[in-house]
Amino acid sequence: MITRHPLGRQDLRIKRRDKVLEIGPGHDPMFRSDVIADKFPHDDTHRCGKVLIYPHQQFIEADGEQLPFEKDAFDYVICNQVLEHADNPARFIEEMVRVGKRGYVETPSMLGEQMFPKESHRWVILLIEDKLVFY
């Protein structure tokens, strides 16, 4: 799904029976996610609180660049405000594509990065001609 709309997350087109993985949601996971993967569950340095896991969600400590799941294990993969922190974003995306059939990636806007820069952000990510560009 490609959207430039800041509220695009409200219409992810996740089907009722889809199995959903969310990578790195921290303190704000989507209720619809079935599995939560977080690389640093005990380090709240870059989030606004402790990792939140709803009762119906399974939690796994995992790096988005090396996910412990089989190919196509999920119908949908969500990565919200995480990719800009990745050591190797290309590997991270390869893993998302490997384990999921469809997905959603949201990153901070260029304006947001200029107005509120964060040291923990390794990348500024733009969508140019339907391609993600990292710098």
Predicted segments, located by residue:
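Conserved N-terminal segment of class I S-adenosyl-L-methionine
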Residues: M1-K71, Y76
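Short, surface-exposed linear patches
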Residues: P41-H46, H56-F59, V82, V99-K101, ...
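Conserved catalytic-core segments centered on acid/base and nucleophilic motifs
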Residues: L67, V77, Q81-A86, F92-M96
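A broadly tuned preference for mixed-charge, low-complexity surface segments
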Residues: P68-N80, L127-Y135
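S-adenosyl-L-methionine-dependent methyltransferase catalytic module, highlighting the catalytic core
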Residues: E61, D87-Y135
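A short beta-strand submotif of the Rossmann-like class I SAM-dependent methyltransferase core
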Residues: E61, Y76-V82, V105
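Active-site flanking residues adjacent to catalytic metal/cofactor-binding acidic residues
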Residues: L21-I23, A37, N80, V105, ...
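Proteins with a high burden of low-complexity, intrinsically disordered sequence enriched in S/T/G/P/A and R
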Residues: F31-R32, D38-C48, E84, A90, ...
